[in-house]
Design a protein with these regions (language model features):
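Noncatalytic regulatory segments and standalone regulatory/sensor domains
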Residues: 226-297
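N-terminal Lys/Arg-rich, disordered targeting/topogenic segments
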Residues: 1-15
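Active-site-adjacent structural segments surrounding the nucleophilic cysteine of cysteine proteases
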Residues: 14-23, 28-157, 294-297
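Extracytoplasmic/periplasmic, Sec-exported soluble proteins
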Residues: 116-125, 138, 158-163, 182, ...
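Active-site-adjacent substructure of cysteine-protease-like catalytic cores
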Residues: 183-234
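Solvent-exposed loop/turn segments at secondary-structure junctions
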Residues: 131, 140, 152-157, 185-187, ...
């Protein structure tokens, strides 16, 4: 009769190894958990330290700006260009050559005969009057308009150069304050008169000086915008397109004043609209109007 088999039991050695294995597993798990906890704690400490540094640097209420954010540059207004007053100064030309060449400010009147005389030969004074009236008042006229006005209101007969008396009488009736002058003994006195004026009509002659005008027995021109720093004036010369609308030194004008005439120049000191009996609104006739000249309302 067979004996019943006994169940095998683990030996002491095997139990010892099992216990050691369990302990090693527990130690490994503890090490891993400890490492993770340590890293987490160290990360939180570093984060807290950075926050403290940030607060010390930027203050508690100030947040550090992103690196990509740029400081807005201050806006600057564009510099405005100074207004060129000469663009609204009228500078009519009187002769036929200017008209045939199509030069700005020339007109058909350059080829016209009026009361037996060629306007291109005698119209310089009337161009000066038209320049002044159109430049200093809200109104405008052409040299032909001024010719007709002077004939009707001043006693000027037409067909020839206009004299100082008719020029002064005509401009006064248009509300312009003006008076005639003789050449002063010194340039300083002449300069002071021009400095205080709005503009002036001057009578020049190459018989007195050829510093600027050649072959010119007698010729009316207009001068505007005296510059105190340079002693220059803006010249309106109806007889020469190369002279017209140029800046020249006032001393050249002074030296060229025609002393053979009773009067050498006429100064304009102001304008009174209420004393203007004309209020002429159109520059009539066929002429080459510059593109830069603004239309008057």
């Amino acid at each position: 009769m067979e004996k019943p088999r006994r169940k095998k039991r683990w030996g002491r050695r095997k139990v010892r190894w099992a216990v050691m294995g369990v302990c090693m597993v527990f130690v490994c798990i503890s090490f891993v958990v400890s490492s993770i906890w340590s890293d987490t704690r160290r990360f939180s400490k570093e984060k807290g330290r950075k926050a403290q540094v940030s607060e010390r640097t930027f203050g508690p209420a100030e947040k550090k700006r992103p690196e990509t954010e740029k400081t807005a540059e201050p806006t600057t207004e564009p510099t405005r260009k100074p207004v060129d007053k000469t663009l609204q100064i009228y500078t009519y030309l009187q002769g036929p050559k200017s008209w045939n060449q199509g030069i700005d400010w020339s007109g058909e009147w350059g080829e016209s005969y009026m009361d037996g005389g060629s306007f291109g030969g005698f119209g310089c004074g009337l161009c000066c009057m038209a320049n002044i009236y159109s430049s200093l008042t809200p109104y405008q006229c052409s040299p032909v308009d001024m010719y007709r006005y002077a004939k009707k209101h001043t006693g000027y007969g037409g067909g020839m150069a206009i004299d100082w008396g008719y020029i002064r009488r005509g401009l006064t009736s248009l509300g312009l304050h003006c008076h005639v002058e003789r050449k002063q003994e010194t340039y300083h006195e002449f300069r002071e008169n021009i400095r205080k004026s709005k503009c002036a009509i001057v009578l020049v002659s190459s018989a007195n000086s050829t510093v600027h005008w050649k072959n010119t027995p007698g010729h009316y021109v207009t001068i505007f915008e005296f510059q105190e720093k340079t002693d220059k004036v803006f010249l309106a010369d109806s007889g020469d397109p190369d002279h017209n609308r140029r800046w020249i030194h006032l001393k050249k004008v002074y030296r060229s004043l025609k002393t053979a005439s009773n009067w050498q120049y006429l100064v304009i000191s102001g304008y009174d609209k209420q004393k203007d009996h004309w209020h002429h609104k159109m520059a009539n006739g066929t002429w080459n109007r510059p593109s830069y000249l603004k239309a008057k309302s």
